């Protein structure tokens, strides 16, 4: 069988038309593939949000006094019984958050007089300057607060964005990832309902996690590595290093947060070099934000690192050491005391480890 392309003169109208049609098909294929990938990620985000939030549906909302970036206090418990509450967790580096922001502001404009809308920045590898610039860029008018991790713990944050609707009765009625019909229906129901509020004694908060600063001795903290090994922090006869990170840091933040991405790469390489040069026990502690056990295992299988990994699914270890930025390295001495906490901008990990010996 002859090849129809070979039979067309290279400069003929028929050949040029064929090339244009073929190029259009390639572009269409790329667009459809990208759209399918985006849809798959959206669906996975929704699944994770709903799975993590399933146990909270129908439960009383958290008791918390939120402080906006302007210093205004919002007492959630005082709103229960008077007005529904819509909390949206987000981050400036989050791509789907950016995509949803126009719709989020539109909801504030159309429902803000009937629903207390609050933009809850996760406070995870973010800063006030970036948040203020983001607010200006997207012309956001709802109150914005920065979480210290406690509200995320109360509401089982697993993805960004994550939507939480609390009805007029003070009970959680919707948790999801998508700005979809289910979210809008939940908001409409919350506005129209006339049920009695849950009592303040019923409202719930996650158990407080003890926090340790430099000089403190770590107690009552145990972790389990991906391979099932139990480690009791604060006990042992040798120093330990806890490397707080997320497996998506290097790749996902490469464009939106290049400094953070490079810091994660630098720390990973430094740790790999140091692991063979010291008698310290090294542990990589991954955040549970957008990370499951299988995600972390995939990272271990595809990344050249020998670092034993731990999934901090509910970010309890992150809260225990007040970690809000990745990468952060916590050094414990042989007596279980916090000797040093190195932030992302600290590039003296090698010297800090030598000083601990």
Regions found by a protein language model. Name each.
Residues 41-77, 181-185, 189-233:
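N-terminal "domain-start" segment that seeds a small globular fold
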Residues 86-87, 117, 163, 241-242, ...:
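Hydrophobic beta-strand anchors of alpha/beta hydrolase catalytic cores
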Residues 132-168, 283, 294-332:
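Short, internal strand/loop/helix patches
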Residues 1-18:
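N-terminal secretory signal peptides that target proteins for export/translocation
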Residues 167-217, 331-357:
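Thiol-/selenol-based redox modules, centered on thioredoxin-like
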Residues 89-106, 244-269:
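Conserved redox-active cysteine motifs that mediate thiol-disulfide chemistry
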Residues 22-31:
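Bacterial N-terminal signal peptides
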Residues 35-37:
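Boundary at the C-terminal end of the N-terminal hydrophobic targeting segment
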């Amino acid at each position: 069988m002859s090849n129809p392309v070979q039979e067309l003169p290279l400069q003929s109208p028929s050949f040029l038309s064929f090339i244009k049609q073929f190029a259009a098909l390639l572009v269409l294929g790329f667009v459809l593939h990208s759209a399918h990938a985006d849809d798959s990620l959206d669906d996975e985000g929704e699944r994770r949000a709903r799975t993590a939030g399933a146990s909270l549906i129908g439960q009383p909302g958290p008791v918390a006094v939120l402080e906006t970036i302007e210093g205004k206090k919002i007492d959630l418990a005082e709103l229960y019984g008077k007005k529904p509450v819509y909390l949206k967790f987000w981050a400036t580096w989050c791509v789907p958050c950016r995509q949803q922001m126009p719709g989020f502001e539109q909801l504030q404009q159309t429902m803000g007089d009937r629903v207390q809308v609050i933009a809850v920045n996760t406070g995870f590898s973010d800063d006030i300057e970036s948040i203020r610039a983001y607010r200006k860029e997207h012309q956001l008018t709802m109150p914005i607060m920065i979480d210290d991790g406690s509200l995320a713990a109360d509401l089982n944050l697993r993805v960004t964005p994550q939507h939480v609707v609390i009805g007029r009765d003070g009970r959680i009625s919707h948790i999801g990832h998508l700005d979809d019909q289910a979210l809008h229906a939940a908001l409409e129901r919350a506005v129209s309902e006339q049920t009695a509020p849950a009592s303040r004694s019923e409202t719930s908060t996650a158990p407080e996690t003890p926090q340790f600063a430099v000089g403190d001795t770590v107690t009552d903290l145990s972790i389990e590595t991906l391979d099932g090994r139990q480690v009791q922090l604060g006990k042992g006869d040798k120093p330990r290093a806890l490397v707080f990170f997320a497996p998506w840091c290097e790749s996902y933040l490469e464009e939106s947060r290049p400094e953070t991405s490079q810091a994660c790469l630098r720390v990973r390489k430094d740790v790999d070099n140091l692991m063979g040069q010291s008698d310290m026990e090294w542990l990589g502690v991954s955040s549970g934000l957008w990370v499951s056990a299988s995600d972390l295992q995939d990272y271990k299988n595809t990344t050249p690192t020998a670092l034993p990994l731990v999934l901090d699914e509910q970010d309890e270890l992150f809260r225990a050491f007040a970690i809000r930025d990745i990468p952060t390295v916590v050094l414990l001495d042989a007596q279980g005391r916090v000797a040093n906490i190195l932030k992302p901008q600290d590039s003296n990990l090698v010297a800090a480890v030598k000083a601990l010996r």
